[in-house]
Curated annotation (Swiss-Prot):
Protein name as catalogued: ATP synthase gamma chain
Subunit field text: F-type ATPases have 2 components, CF(1) - the catalytic core - and CF(0) - the membrane proton channel. CF(1) has five subunits: alpha(3), beta(3), gamma(1), delta(1), epsilon(1). CF(0) has three main subunits: a, b and c.
Gene transcribed to yield this protein: atpG
InterPro entries reported in the protein's UniProt record: ATP_synth_F1_ATPase_gsu, ATP_synth_F1_gsu, ATP_synth_F1_gsu_CS
GO molecular function, one term: proton-transporting ATP synthase activity, rotational mechanism
Originating species: Exiguobacterium sibiricum (strain DSM 17290 / CCUG 55495 / CIP 109462 / JCM 13490 / 255-15)
PANTHER family: ATP SYNTHASE GAMMA CHAIN, ATP SYNTHASE SUBUNIT GAMMA, MITOCHONDRIAL
GO biological process: proton motive force-driven plasma membrane ATP synthesis
Amino acid sequence: MASLREIQMRINSTKSTKQITKAMNMVSASKLNRAQAHSAKFQPYMLKMQEVLGTIANGTTGASHPMLEKRPVKKTGYIVITSDRGLAGAYNANVLREVYREINEKHTTDSYVLFVVGKVGVQFFRSRGITVTDAITGLNDSPSYVDVAEIVKRTVSAFTLGEIDELKLCYNHFMSVISQEVKVETLLPLGEIEASSSTTYEYEPSEEQILAELLPRYAESLIFGALLDAKVAEHASRMTAMQSATDNADDLIGRLTLVYNRARQAAITQEITEIVSGAAAQQ
């Protein structure tokens, strides 16, 4: 049985760990609120662009663009969004497992390319000998479009230049504080864009020119929007994980304290027994 000193050291160590996890939980809660606000501010821009493009794409003029049209798929691009840090529960494992399963089941080595956001994702693929075509790491907790513009434009241009025939977006979608859903969505070709209203517009210059200008921006906005959504999911997952760790620390401290008290009581009983036995032996 462990000594009283060893048990007390374990209790103190667990209390120190609890302080850290509790602090991380509070920090993640604060970051979650900011990330949600940041994501919400971006939504009106994306919805308005969807409204305009949907009106053109679904109109009667027959305006079209290569980004809207399907073509035979010889190579697929994957944008995989992960975090730079761990301690976020199954946040990274879930999306990486899904992407890894899909590329193993559906692709040969030269029929896909990976664009990865986050150190965890980069390390995951490289440790398995999988080439990462492009990556970005070190994003802050509320990234701006400028922070990710290079990789976003690179992925969209890979499709428009014919380097890939479809582009998939893989990330964790925020459902609630305790729930995130892994999404693997086909981003390009865009397919049908639903108009969010019945508003009609007159366009200058032509609708084809507007599509050519706005469709790449719309695709880029979808990627950035998914990144903001994933950031919200990351903070929520980390907050939940740290709360769970704090609760587990409380349980462990309670059990160790019970063991400590029993051991202390046993030690006291042993001392009393020895004193009584010694006194009896002297009589």
